[in-house]
Amino acid sequence: MEIRKRKGKQVGRLTVTDKQHQEDLQRLRLLRPIDDDFMRCLFKDNIPLAEFVLRIITDKPDLIITECETQKDMKRLAGARSICLDAYGTDSVGKKYDLEVQRQDKGADPHRARYHSSVMDIENLHSGQEFKELPDTYTIFIIEKDFYGQGEAVYPIERINLATGKSFEDGEHILYVNGEYRGDSAMGKLMYDFNCTKADDMNFELMANRTRYLKENPKGVSEMCKIMEDMRSESLKEVALRMLSAGKYALEEIANISGLSLDEVKKLKAERSA
């Protein structure tokens, strides 16, 4: 914080950084598990919580999760569109789970679910392997609203043989979870928790404890603020890179519009040209 003297007294004046920090703290207070930025932090290095949530959603009480990554970058084919998974887990028998939260229906388009599922296939079949070695995959979209409007807690999407009416059994599973669902069941309580801003209002201890850490513990708050600062920085860089790609802006203009320093813009240009 900058301090200026005025008639013998010190008067505090917030810098831009201080103002942003205060805005971040306010934003943090309003974040819920159904917000993807917060959800990724909830699940980061937290296999017990991921396992607990997946057990409820998949209705597999004996599910054992052995690995869980957040913001898993998936791009195995050159030129293909990359995606970053909110939470990517593996269970004790090798099945894969992609857990996503979507605030808006457009983010849950069925084609997106199809692509997420296909990307997991590409990620998990290596050269020389047989197709039958593909692991079962679960693409799970938790959507803030009831995407299909039928009041169900979960909408399982499975391929079937239309001629026989039997399951295709290709190991691909897509689940749309209704974020509006409420009730006394574990799923109803879980969706309630996903929409809570306060840990004290939550039903489940694992969810509440992690939320309390990220929102109330100084170390957790610092972690969240650092993540929000990094995201803001990445957003500024994206603006600058688009302007550099346009090729019609002076570096000083890019710095002024993007909010980056001139040195940062020069560095981006050098990296882009390398």
Model-derived features: positions:
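Accessory alpha/beta interaction modules
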Residues: 1-173, 183-185
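Short, charged alpha-helical interaction segments and adjacent helix-coil junctions
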Residues: 2-29, 97-102, 188-274
